[in-house]
Amino acid sequence: FDSLDIIDEWDFINNDGNTANETVDEDNYGQHNHGTMVFSTLAGYDPGNLIGPAFDSEFLLAKTEDVPNESQVEEDNYVAALEWGEQNGADVASSSLGYLDWYSYCDMDGNTGVTTIAVDIATYLGVLCITSAGNWGTSEPPPDPCDTLYYYISAPADADSVISVGAVNSEGDIAYFSSHGPTYDGRIKPEVCARGVSTWCVNANSDSYRTASGTSLSAPLVSGAAAVILSAHPDWTPMQVREAMMMTSDRVDTPDNDYGYGVIDVMAAIDYETSAIDENSIPDEFSILNIYPNPFNPTTTMQFKVGTDGHTSLHVYDITGHLVETIINEKLMAGDHYYKWDASGLSSGIYFIHINLPTGNITQKITYLK
């Protein structure tokens, strides 16, 4: 760790700038153990023993988990840490945690969990969020979907924009403990997998190394890989990195709710050409100038310009691709146009605005927060 570039740190439990153990309880419960193992997997640098994929990055360290207790304030700490990270220029947020004690499977819809919503907002603001899928894979699915949450992924792994990470062994086989998908609304989870069985890491209690297992160890490997991809493509958005990693993983042709899209392939992801819109390819005849505010509650205004007279359609879709509302479906005259959309009566979450003219189309993501 001596060579790592830690530019700032903050303890959101004790509200100070020290992320090491500070209290007797933290010592007794081994507050430092989990974070040390995870951070070493991500960033450790000891040639011949351990080299994490992101060892040459800059780091912000945030302590949000009160290990002796499991309470909802930890979600608030996580949200505060995401906001702090975004304000301080974070490109990737790696977390090895999950919240399930006060949620049911019915809540894993991408729109309910406090941290789930925060991840979608952070992604919109330019922070790629990666989190562990969870270690409840040996449990049985709850008889009633609205019973206590086990077996499935937990918040914030259910977020629409997150990269949730399952665990495989050295042979690429799914770990028996790795939590499963799908989300309650039917999306495949996890997104990808990495090694999380007998993963090499630092021993937090001695000057040595050890192995550890869990999706807590697979998530930082994917986070480090994402940092490498971003170093090759600094202009990519979080969703472009997410797409590249998923579309180049080894099960992309047969994704399922154990492996997701499979084990990542970093070099293939770097070479991947994302399907995101190239601004230079957008026709001159029209453009979306602004959608504001975004995130919004409950109304937002869409401003766009039509270069020539012609038929225009503007639709709103939810995250599953279902049509929510058609706002425009008529001939428009050339010029600037403004439309206010009211989402009252809809659930909080991610929606997509799609505008179409004979000359082309464009899609933009919006976030509705109640």
PLM features: residue spans?
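Short acidic, glycine-rich surface-loop motifs adjacent to enzyme active sites
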Residues: 83-107, 132-133
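Catalytic-core regions built around general acid/base machinery
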Residues: 111-126, 155, 161
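Subtilisin-like serine protease catalytic core
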Residues: 1-10, 14-74, 88-91, 124-126, ...
